[in-house]
Amino acid sequence: MSAGIEYIVKRTNRLHTAGVAILIVAVAISCTGCTDKPDWRVTDDGILEYNKPAPGSDYRLRTLEETDNYTLCEVTYESRGAVIEGLIRMPKTAAGKGKSVPGVVLLPGATVTKEGEQGLARYLEGIGYASITIDQRNLGGIDMEADLEMFLSGVEPIEHRMVYDALFAAEVLRKQPNVDPDRIAYLGESNGGRFAIIAYALDSDALGVVAISTCGYGIDAAVAAGRIRDPEAIRFYRSIDPDTYLSSIRPHHRPGKFVMIHSLNDPIIGYENAQATYIAAGWRKSLHTIETEGHGYSAEMNPFLESELAEIFS
């Protein structure tokens, strides 16, 4: 059993008794027609659904750096009760040539800031791609127990809102004049990779996702083993598990690709866990490995990133 499943099972058991009482309250709220967000839904099968974000003038840009090779802008936007800050890095390869470049929504791992992710963003800029990197809520940290309590009481969990933040970031990137809105992909590291996978599954216009040093939670395996029994807890945990979405891409989703890159000697997320998630994917996919011990992006992954993004955007 993976560490992710163990974490979830322990908290589900702790909350089971309280959850029944909370669920009764949630049903009462639902019957009165009161919901936290009318465009936030979780299906009976545990699939998260959002209406597509439509940013107008409700985001702000401020130029931080401008060189012969790139422009770096700070972006700020409001998303479901929070102010999200990000950085847009734009290569100048297309400037003044009437061309547009593909764009990547870049989601860092837990505790990593948008500034701390700029090494990867600079690499993407160097091979011709724009990127938007956001400071995720709680800097990507999650509290599953608190989110489950919110869900059982009919309140939109933070982890769901973090997916929406990524979807909003994609729409902001699509609005940039030098970005091709039809060529957008998601790229995430560690916990950011989980959100990247789910956001890609919900974004029917995106072309692919690259997940570095990440894995799903294996919720269905825990349910099958009888370790999680409460139906509403199952529905919530499936909604935050990337594995749930790997075989359920909506029929109208554009042809895309699922890419994983992982160290065989990752000390945080074992390769076997990443492999289990990769096997669960039912669509065009690739898995690349490096041997260097470490967790997250490293320059050793660059050849895989370059070739896979070129294929995704071709």
Question: Which residues fall in each region the model found?
Answer:
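Secretory targeting signatures
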Residues: 1-37
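N-terminal cap/lid segment of alpha/beta-hydrolase-fold proteins
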Residues: 53-98
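Short beta-strand element of the alpha/beta-hydrolase
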Residues: 98-109
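Cap/lid segment of the alpha/beta-hydrolase catalytic domain
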Residues: 111-164, 221-227
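A catalytic-pocket lid/entrance helix-loop region that shapes and gates access to the active site
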Residues: 153-155, 214-242
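Primarily recognizes the serine-hydrolase "nucleophile elbow" in alpha/beta-hydrolase
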Residues: 167-228
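The feature captures the conserved acid-bearing segment of alpha/beta-hydrolase catalytic domains
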Residues: 231-280
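C-terminal catalytic histidine-bearing segment of alpha/beta-hydrolase fold enzymes
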Residues: 275-314
